[in-house]
C-alpha cells in the first residue's frame, strides 16, 4: 500500500554514489518527492508535520536533496543526510550509520534525535 501522493520517479543514477542503506533506498524509491497521506506524526509525545520527502533526482528544481545537503552541510555530521521537511523550514535528517532520524530546527540551529528509521516509517505509514 502506497501511503504517499504526488511522488516523482527516482533516477537511480542520481543516488548511486551516495552509499545509502538498502532500507532507505527502498523507501526513497516509493516516496521520492512525495507527500505522505498522514502528515502529522506523534513521536515521543510531540507532534511533527511531514510536508514532503525531498526529491533525490539531481536535476530536481524543487525540494532538491542535493541543494539541502549543501545548504545544511555546516550543521550536519558526515553521516547525516536531509530527507524530508516540514511546512516551516525545518528538516528531518537520517544518520545513515545509525539509522536514527533527527529533526533540524532552522530557527535555533538545534538538531534533536527523534527515533529509529524503521519506527519513523511505521508511524508515517500509520502502523504505530
Predicted features by range, described:
Residues 16-18, 80, 102, 116, ...:
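Functionally constrained cores in energy, signaling, and assembly domains
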Residues 107-128:
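Compact, glycine/acidic-enriched structural inserts
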Residues 1-92:
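A surface-exposed partner-binding patch
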Residues 90-91, 95-111:
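Short, compact, well-ordered microdomains
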Residues 44-48, 103, 114, 121:
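Solvent-exposed, non-transmembrane amphipathic alpha-helical segments
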